[in-house]
Amino acid sequence: MFAHTALRQRCAKWLLATGLFLLLGACVEKPSTLERVKEDGVLRVITRNSPATYFQDRNGETGFEYELVQHFADDLGVKLQIETADNLDELYDALGKPSGPVLAAAGLVSSERRKTQVKYSHPYLEVTPQVIYRNGRARPTGAKGLVGKKIMVLKGSSHADQLAELKKQYPALQYEESDAVEVVDLLRMVDEGQIDLTLVDSNELAMNQVYFPNVRVAFDLGDTRDQRWAVAAGEDNSLLNEINEFLDKAQKNGTLQRLKDRYYGHVDVLGYVGAYTFAQHLQQRLPKYEKHFKSYAKVEQVDWRLLAAIGYQESMWQPEVTSKTGVRGLMMLTQRTAQAMGVSNRLDPRQSIQGGAKYFMKIKEELDDSIQEPDRTWFALAAYNVGSGHLEDARTLAKREKLNPNKWLDVKKMLPRLAQKQWYRQTKYGYARGGEPVHFVANIRRYYDILTWVTQPQLEGQVAEGNLHVPGVNKDKPADKSSPM
C-alpha cells in the first residue's frame, strides 16, 4: 500500500513537472517578423520587373521601388534581397508562403479583393489611373466610350477592378486581363495599334511615353490613388509598423521627394537635337574639348571622333550636366564607373573624357572574340549604354531566332524585345529599355559620320569659319563612311 502511494506521488510530481515545462515553453514568444528579418540579416522583397519598379541597367540594379526599399533595408541594417514575380497574382501569393518574401514593393494600389491576403502600408506615391489611346484614332471622352473597344489590362490589377465595376453599369463593356504582359507591353500595343485602349497609372505613363510617340491620355478614370507596400495578412504588425515609420520619415526628410524628382520630375533633354544644332555645337563647344578627345583617344587607341560622338550623345558636350539617375559630366559617368576608371571629379571635362575613353575600350575588349569590326564597335556602344549583360541577353535571343548574334543588324532587332515581358522573362538579366541602345548607337553613328566628314583637311577651315554644310541637311555633301577603328 505504501509502495502504491509513493508511486502515485512520484507520478503526480512528474506530471506536474511536465506540465510546468510545457506551460513555460508555451509562454516563450516566437520572434516577431521584424526580429526574424534582423536576425537573418536579410530583407526579402518581391517586386515587378518594370521601369517604374525594378530593373537592371549598365550601372546595376535600379528603379524607384528598388531605391526606396534599399533605403529601408539600410535603415534596418540588413541586406536587401530582391525577387521578381511574373504577374500580380504570383506576387501576392508569394507573400503568403512561409519561406517567401516578407514585403511586396511593386507600385501596388490598395484593393478590396486583396485585403484577405495582405495588409497595406502608409501611402508613398500618389498616382492617377488613365485611359490610354492611340493618337489619330477616335478619343473616348468618358466611361461609356470604352464600350466596343479592344481593351487589355494587367491581370489582377486595380485597373481590372475598375473595369469590373464599370461593367456593372455598362454590361456591354468587354476587356481582357493578361498575365503575360507588363505596362511597357500594353503601351507598345496601343502605340502599334494592336489594342485600342489600356489603363495605366500616371507615373508609369510619364516614365515610358517618350518611347511610344503615338500614345495619348484619353481621360483620367477616377480620382488619384495611393501606391503602398504590402505584407502578408497573417504576419504580425512589427514589420508593418517599422515600414510605416520609415515611409513617414522618408516623406518628412525629403528622401521620397528626391526619388520622385529623379524618376518622374525631369524631362530627358539629351538625345538627338537636329543636325543644325549639332553644327552649331561643333563650332561653339567642341573646340574647348577637342584636344582632350584626341589625347585620350591616342592613349586608348580609338578614333577621337568616335569618342567625341559618344560625348555629344551623352551630354551635348556640356561638362556640368547631371541626369535624373545621377550620372554626371561630359561623358555621363556613374560614380562607380568613375571610381573604377580613376576619375576623382566627374565634372572635370579632361577627367571625364579620360574615364569615358578607358571605360569604352574596356567594354570593347571584353566582348566575345567572335564579334568582328565594325560590328564590334556598335556592340561596345550598345553595352556602354545598356550594360554588357543585357547585350548578351539580346545575342542569346538572336541565336534562338536563328539570327547572327555577331552582327549588329540582327542583334539590334532583338534589343527592343528586352522591354517585352514575353521575351525578357526568358533572359538572364531581365527587363531593359532595349530600344534605348538602338537609338544610342544610331545617333552616335550619325554624329561620327558628320565628324569624320567635317574633319577632312579641306573642310576643317569651314568649321572654324561657320560655313559648315552638314550631311543629312545638305544632300550634296555625303558623309564619309570610314570605320571608327
UniProtKB/Swiss-Prot annotation:
<dbReference type="InterPro" id="IPR023703">
    <property type="entry name" value="MltF"/>
</dbReference>
<dbReference type="InterPro" id="IPR000189">
    <property type="entry name" value="Transglyc_AS"/>
</dbReference>
<feature type="signal peptide">
    <location>
        <begin position="1"/>
        <end position="29"/>
    </location>
</feature>
<keyword id="KW-0732">Signal</keyword>
<dbReference type="InterPro" id="IPR023346">
    <property type="entry name" value="Lysozyme-like_dom_sf"/>
</dbReference>
<feature type="region of interest" description="Non-LT domain">
    <location>
        <begin position="30"/>
        <end position="267"/>
    </location>
</feature>
<dbReference type="GO" id="GO:0016998">
    <property type="term" value="P:cell wall macromolecule catabolic process"/>
</dbReference>
<dbReference type="Pfam" id="PF01464">
    <property type="entry name" value="SLT"/>
</dbReference>
<feature type="region of interest" description="Disordered">
    <location>
        <begin position="465"/>
        <end position="485"/>
    </location>
</feature>
<keyword id="KW-0961">Cell wall biogenesis/degradation</keyword>
<keyword id="KW-0456">Lyase</keyword>
<keyword id="KW-0998">Cell outer membrane</keyword>
<comment type="similarity">
    <text>In the C-terminal section; belongs to the transglycosylase Slt family.</text>
</comment>
<feature type="region of interest" description="LT domain">
    <location>
        <begin position="268"/>
        <end position="485"/>
    </location>
</feature>
<comment type="function">
    <text>Murein-degrading enzyme that degrades murein glycan strands and insoluble, high-molecular weight murein sacculi, with the concomitant formation of a 1,6-anhydromuramoyl product. Lytic transglycosylases (LTs) play an integral role in the metabolism of the peptidoglycan (PG) sacculus. Their lytic action creates space within the PG sacculus to allow for its expansion as well as for the insertion of various structures such as secretion systems and flagella.</text>
</comment>
<comment type="similarity">
    <text>In the N-terminal section; belongs to the bacterial solute-binding protein 3 family.</text>
</comment>
<feature type="compositionally biased region" description="Basic and acidic residues">
    <location>
        <begin position="474"/>
        <end position="485"/>
    </location>
</feature>
<dbReference type="InterPro" id="IPR001638">
    <property type="entry name" value="Solute-binding_3/MltF_N"/>
</dbReference>
<protein>
    <recommendedName>
        <fullName>Membrane-bound lytic murein transglycosylase F</fullName>
        <ecNumber>4.2.2.n1</ecNumber>
    </recommendedName>
</protein>
<dbReference type="Pfam" id="PF00497">
    <property type="entry name" value="SBP_bac_3"/>
</dbReference>
<dbReference type="GO" id="GO:0008933">
    <property type="term" value="F:peptidoglycan lytic transglycosylase activity"/>
</dbReference>
<feature type="active site">
    <location>
        <position position="314"/>
    </location>
</feature>
<dbReference type="GO" id="GO:0071555">
    <property type="term" value="P:cell wall organization"/>
</dbReference>
<dbReference type="GO" id="GO:0009279">
    <property type="term" value="C:cell outer membrane"/>
</dbReference>
<dbReference type="GO" id="GO:0009253">
    <property type="term" value="P:peptidoglycan catabolic process"/>
</dbReference>
<dbReference type="InterPro" id="IPR008258">
    <property type="entry name" value="Transglycosylase_SLT_dom_1"/>
</dbReference>
<keyword id="KW-0472">Membrane</keyword>
